[in-house]
Regions:
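N-terminal structured subdomain of primase-like DNA metabolism proteins
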Residues: 1-97
C-alpha cells in the first residue's frame, strides 16, 4: 500500500464517528432514550460489527466505548479499536472502502 497523504489523514480525522460506524457495521441503532450529561451533541449507539456487540457514545469524530471504558477520535482510531488493527492496517481498510 502506498503511504497515505496528510490531506487524506485529515479527512479521516474529521469524519463523524457515526458515519464510520454505519460504513463498518452490520447493524447500527441509535438509543433514543439516551440523555447526555455533558455535551448535548453526544448520542449513544448500539452496534454489531466484526462479530461483536458494541455500545458507543459519539460526538462528532470522537467516540467512547462504554463497555471497554476507552475511546478515541477519528476514523483510524475507531477502525483500530473495533478490529484490533495497527495504524497501517486500519488505514488500508479505510482506503479500500
Amino acid at each position: 500500500m502506498r503511504s497515505v497523504d496528510n490531506s487524506e489523514l485529515g479527512r479521516w480525522r474529521e469524519l463523524d464517528s457515526i458515519h464510520v460506524l454505519r460504513l463498518l457495521a452490520e447493524h447500527v441503532k441509535e438509543d433514543l432514550s439516551f440523555h447526555p450529561r455533558s455535551s448535548h451533541l453526544t448520542t449513544r449507539w448500539h452496534v454489531h460489527v466484526a462479530g461483536h456487540d458494541w455500545e458507543f457514545l459519539c460526538t462528532g469524530p470522537k467516540f467512547w466505548d462504554v463497555r471497554m471504558d476507552c475511546g478515541g477520535g477519528g476514523a483510524v482510531d475507531l477502525v483500530m479499536h473495533i478490529y484490533g488493527l495497527n495504524f497501517k492496517a486500519a488505514a488500508k481498510l479505510l482506503k479500500d472502502m
